[in-house]
Amino acid sequence: METLTASFFVRIASSIRAGYPTNMTDPIALVDRFGRRHDSLRISITDRCNIRCFYCMPEHDAEFLPRSGVLTFEEIERLAGLLVKRCGVRDIRITGGEPLVRRDCVDLIRMLARIDGLEDLSMTTNGMLLRDHAADLRSAGLKRLNVSLDTLDEATFVKIARRPGVDRVIDGIDAAIEAGFESIKLNALAIRGLSESELVGLVRFSIEKSVTLRFIEFMPLDSDRAWKSKDVLSGDACLKLLSEAFGDVTPTGRENPSAPAETFTLRCDGREGTIGIIRSVTRPFCGDCNRLRLTADGGLRNCLFSQSETPLRDAMRSGCDDDKLIQKIQQCVGEKHAAHGIDSDDFRPPERAMHAIGG
């Protein structure tokens, strides 16, 4: 019988918090030293993109992975299956770069949707290619979509994305609605000096389309390393602006303890809408983090802001078996810090920009 050590109670508490039966004979539960159980996986399938948002990647001369350096669909399927079937991962989100620029992306969705035990399969996209792919993605098994939309104005879109195309994004959102996804959320970065004039229009748009809108505090993930804390339009500032425009903004909590967004309801022209505020900078939610990230070249990251990665691609290609891969995954989880530390004096942004990590 296991002795009643502190680690015993941590694992009991973690299992209860995660909503799973406690199984003390299971050595593979991905619980870190702070009791956080990791059941959510972000998989980046490319570091390439068809726009150049300043908060994500450089405008010119971006260095991309060679094709041989990117995980194959079969390698992604192997790791995803291992994490779901043997490590308790329950949801997977496909990211990039822009995932839809990778050829035959729909085939990968179909492969992942067949994994026994996977409860949720979603994607984050810039929406530019959704008109061409939304129906096929839905029929392949993709359940939910997050679409980046920082503005409805073309001039502002070009300022952010350094490419034209907001009309294509809006058309892609319409295509996603037509395809019948279980959930569609719009993600808007909250950037001081830019977003203040966009908030109200985006809220009206989201209510008109009957989708959820989330404002995400601007984070230090830009390739130019130009981020400063003064550039963050805080969640509190967003709520103040929305209250001035719409009146009561009523908090409704989080979808679940590990959800990054605090949700609110408000009314516009007699219709109710739902918004989310993700305070990654001013009110971090690291204590409830349940996420792991897999980069396009097979690096496993235990935090978006981690300074290190566990290289799983090379391990697989050198013949590493599943048990050894799990050991590497467990070690990565075990090294996770308590928090990202953006507010600390010694904080350093990750070496990779957002497009190379995966959104």
Curated annotation (Swiss-Prot):
- Which gene produces this protein? moaA
Q: What is the lineage of its organism?
A: Bacteria, Pseudomonadati, Planctomycetota, Planctomycetia, Pirellulales
| Co-factor note (free text) | Binds 2 [4Fe-4S] clusters. Binds 1 [4Fe-4S] cluster coordinated with 3 cysteines and an exchangeable S-adenosyl-L-methionine and 1 [4Fe-4S] cluster coordinated with 3 cysteines and the GTP-derived substrate.
Q: Which domain of life is it from?
A: Bacteria
* EC number(s) stated in the UniProt entry for this protein: 4.1.99.22
The UniProt entry's sequence similarity note says: Belongs to the radical SAM superfamily. MoaA family.
Keyword Ribonucleoprotein assigned to the entry: answer is no
Record-given protein name: GTP 3',8-cyclase
Its recorded reaction(s) are: GTP + AH2 + S-adenosyl-L-methionine = (8S)-3',8-cyclo-7,8-dihydroguanosine 5'-triphosphate + 5'-deoxyadenosine + L-methionine + A + H(+)
Biological function = Catalyzes the cyclization of GTP to (8S)-3',8-cyclo-7,8-dihydroguanosine 5'-triphosphate.
Residues binding S-adenosyl-L-methionine are 55, 97, 148, 219
The cross-references to PROSITE patterns, in alphabetical order and at most eight, read: MOAA_NIFB_PQQE, RADICAL_SAM
The GO molecular function terms of this record are: 4 iron, 4 sulfur cluster binding; cyclic pyranopterin monophosphate synthase activity; GTP 3',8'-cyclase activity; GTP binding; metal ion binding; S-adenosyl-L-methionine binding
- Quote the InterPro entries the UniProt record gives: Aldolase_TIM, Elp3/MiaA/NifB-like_rSAM, MoaA, MoaA_NifB_PqqE_Fe-S-bd_CS, MoaA_twitch, MoCo_biosynth_MoaA/MoaC, rSAM
- Iron-sulfur found in the keyword field: yes
Q: What class of enzyme is it?
A: lyase
Q: Which organism is it from?
A: Rhodopirellula baltica (strain DSM 10527 / NCIMB 13988 / SH1)
